[in-house]
A protein has these predicted regions:
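Intrinsically disordered, low-complexity
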Residues: 1-102, 205-207, 211
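Exported/periplasmic cell-wall-interacting domains
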Residues: 65-67, 72-76, 80-211
Length: 211
């Protein structure tokens, strides 16, 4: 089984043998560099890669992504804060660790789910519940070693699409900063079928290529 992404068509295809057996909507980055002052949009870089792993993703680059999706929360209105649970099971301040205030959390949850409250778990990580990582296999052994590194681009969903899926609304995929956005149910389907299994070959085609 191989994965093939056609960014010009917003299409991810599953290939078995010489035949494409299924396709899914998938949106990557733009064909040329963008101008977002926070982090410029970039193309999803063409090439042949190897799927490495699937895991929750956190990064200091984006405030809402400093906390893992699904992390337990405690509302603390008396001190105008929200606490989140650390891996140690202790609690820490969202405001102190991310700069995100309680009002922003409530407003964001209302935007996503239509309810003015602090949710029970963190549903704001920009990369969704899980990210699927890949790397350029320079020595052809399908193992991340030597000077090889994981790509900063990855498959993931978004908080908006996770909310739409949860509320049974139409999924509105949007372009990314270079990663590949998937619909939550499509991610689960591909994952359960073994499409994201480590060592799977993954090809990003040029923007002018079609399936």
């Amino acid at each position: 089984m191989e994965l093939h992404f056609f960014p010009g068509q917003n299409l991810l295809a599953i290939k078995k043998g010489k035949v494409f057996i299924s396709t899914y909507d998938a949106w990557g980055g733009p064909a040329s560099m963008g101008s977002d002052p926070r982090m410029a949009e970039e193309p999803t870089w063409p090439g042949t890669y190897i799927i490495h792993s699937t895991h929750s993703y956190v990064t200091p680059s984006w405030p809402f992504s400093k906390i893992k999706w699904g992390t337990a929360l405690q509302d603390k209105p008396e001190i105008n804060d929200v606490y989140y649970q650390l891996p140690s099971k202790k609690w820490a301040s969202v405001k102190k660790d991310t700069g995100i205030e309680r009002k922003k959390i409530i407003d964001q949850y209302f935007t996503l789910y239509g309810k003015m409250k602090v949710p029970a778990t963190w549903v704001f990580n920009d990369f969704g519940p899980i990210a699927i990582r890949w790397f350029k296999d320079t020595n052809g052994n399908k193992i991340l070693d030597k000077k090889e590194t994981l790509s900063g681009q990855m498959f993931h969903t978004t908080p908006d699409n996770e909310a739409e899926n949860s509320l049974d609304k139409p999924i509105n995929l949007v372009p990314s900063h270079g990663c590949i956005h998937l619909k939550p149910r499509d991610r689960d389907t591909i994952l359960n079928s073994g499409g994201f299994k480590p060592k799977t070959i993954f090809v990003v085609h040029n923007y002018n290529e079609t399936i």
